[in-house]
């Protein structure tokens, strides 16, 4: 037990569906790793950025560094966070400090923002080459919720959110979008602070206790818990179910298709 709410294995998908469509008014969903299979592209872009940067840093200083780990470093330091915060946290783990800079920094500037902007260039290149796939279970679940009358918001630290939603034909699914551009414009703190999700709930005119947060990132689940949202669903894409629960997820699923009518029982129960 983590102290962030009791979990029971007695909940069935049927009971969860009843809560979904009668108790709650809105869904606030992350994008990368929940709706679209773009998390791996982000991780690869970060690896390209940091491995190159640390090699150049080694050439200048003689210090050596452990290369970026696609699984552990992405999950712990970057997933779900604004770019500049992720750059700061990863470099701190390697004992490197840089100035914050500003959002408009050129990609060759050695600042948190500058490196983040270079990462976006790498991501754009990968996206153009590979395209975007969705998680069908997520799309089916969100469309069912929309048809059932729930308001919908996408909340993402990504600056590519609108572009990706358009590419997969899901723009019209959402009533509100709070993405990296909006987070920068409003100067909101990123995950694990709840401000992005709270802003989405405010725009939807839905109190947090009546909204569901869906996240695959530990920092995002922590944000949902910090915002006192009525239900936080953790999507376990990286074999971290226990960690998602520890951060405050009420329910953890491998795929949101598990929560569709007639599917199997979720791994823990929603709050009553």
What are these regions (language model features)?
Residues 131, 150-151, 155, 159-212, ...:
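Substrate-recognition "cap/lid" segment bordering the active-site pocket of phosphatases
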Residues 152, 231-232:
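Hydrophobic beta-strand scaffold residues
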Residues 17-136, 147:
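N-terminal helical cap/lid subdomain that shapes the substrate entry/recognition surface
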Residues 1-29, 105, 264-272:
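Non-catalytic pre-domain segments flanking phosphatase-related domains
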Residues 175-176, 230, 249-250:
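Receiver (REC) domain switch/active-site residues of two-component response regulators
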Residues 251-256:
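Short acidic-hydrophobic, aromatic-tinged amphipathic segments that line or gate anion-handling sites
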Residues 45, 86, 137, 160-164, ...:
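Phosphate- and divalent-cation-binding pockets in alpha/beta enzyme and binding domains
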Residues 235:
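Conserved acidic donor-binding loop of glycosyltransferase catalytic domains
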């Amino acid at each position: 037990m983590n102290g962030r709410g009791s979990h029971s294995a007695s909940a069935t998908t049927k009971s969860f569906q009843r809560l979904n469509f009668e108790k709650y008014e809105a869904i606030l969903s992350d994008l990368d790793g929940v709706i679209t299979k773009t998390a791996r592209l982000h991780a690869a872009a970060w690896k390209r950025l940091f491995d190159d940067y640390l090699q150049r840093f080694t050439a200048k200083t003689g210090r050596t560094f452990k290369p970026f780990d696609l699984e552990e470093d992405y999950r712990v330091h970057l997933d779900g966070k604004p770019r500049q915060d992720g750059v700061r946290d990863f470099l701190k783990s390697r004992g490197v400090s840089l100035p914050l800079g500003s959002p408009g920094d050129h990609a060759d500037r050695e600042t948190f923002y500058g490196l983040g902007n270079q990462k976006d260039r790498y991501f754009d290149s990968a996206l153009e080459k590979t395209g975007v796939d969705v998680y069908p279970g997520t799309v089916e679940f969100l469309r069912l919720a929309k048809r059932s009358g729930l308001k919908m918001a996408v909340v993402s630290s990504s600056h590519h959110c609108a572009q990706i939603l358009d590419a997969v034909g899901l723009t019209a699914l959402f009533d509100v979008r709070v993405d990296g551009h909006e987070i920068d414009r409003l100067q909101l703190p990123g995950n694990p602070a709840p401000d992005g999700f709270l802003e989405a709930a405010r725009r939807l005119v839905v109190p947090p206790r009546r909204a569901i947060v869906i996240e695959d990132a530990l920092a995002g689940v922590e944000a949902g818990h910090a915002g006192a949202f009525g239900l936080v669903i953790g999507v376990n894409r990286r074999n971290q179910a226990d960690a998602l629960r520890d951060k405050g997820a009420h329910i953890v699923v491998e795929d949101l298709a598990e929560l569709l009518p007639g599917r199997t029982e979720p791994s823990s129960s929603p709050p009553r």
